[in-house]
Swiss-Prot record:
Pfam families: YbeY. PANTHER family: ENDORIBONUCLEASE YBEY, CHLOROPLASTIC. Single strand-specific metallo-endoribonuclease involved in late-stage 70S ribosome quality control and in maturation of the 3' terminus of the 16S rRNA. It comes from Rhodococcus erythropolis (strain PR4 / NBRC 100887). HAMAP family: Endoribonucl_YbeY. The lineage of its organism: Bacteria, Bacillati, Actinomycetota, Actinomycetes, Mycobacteriales. Zn(2+) binds at residues 118, 122, 128. This is Endoribonuclease YbeY. Its main location: cytoplasm. PROSITE patterns: UPF0054 (PS01306). Keywords: Cytoplasm, Endonuclease, Hydrolase, Metal-binding, Nuclease, Ribosome biogenesis, rRNA processing, Zinc.
Amino acid sequence: MSIEVSNESGMDISEPELISVARFVIARMDVHPAAELSMVLVDSATMADLHVRWMDLPGPTDVMSFPMDELEPGGRPDSPEPGPSMLGDIVLCPSFAADQADKAGHSLAHELALLTVHGVLHLLGYDHAEPEEEKEMFGLQNSLLEEWYEDLRRIDREAALAERDQKLLGKTGFVDGVDR
């Protein structure tokens, strides 16, 4: 799975975190492992231009998704085909997202993770134009985001235990005599 991030926003954003959440969602949604995703972070003016050009709506927005192939929600796992080689592009506007994060009372990092999940789901064919679609998509979005956070906590716990074990074993000399 290849995920490329291009930060043209002028803001300091954790690209590895965006890649992590995108990779998690793509894997959890059973997208073929050869799939590729491109993410671009832009400033408000660029996002406003894209928003008018593609959605005919004024002003910037938080996230836009540009799928390469039309996919049906939930259609990927049962598909006999290996899946698209390129899922598409996600465009994020960190400055717009920062305002949303402030209003929601959480961090910009959390907002960008949420928007990344949202963008990937759009690439996979999910939408929220109708109330039932919105309920399904936002429920899945929140569930995936929470699963990703739990996965990060698990990884942190395992790393802390491994570090503790390394210190304990290193002090007793067990590690020094073991072939690696």
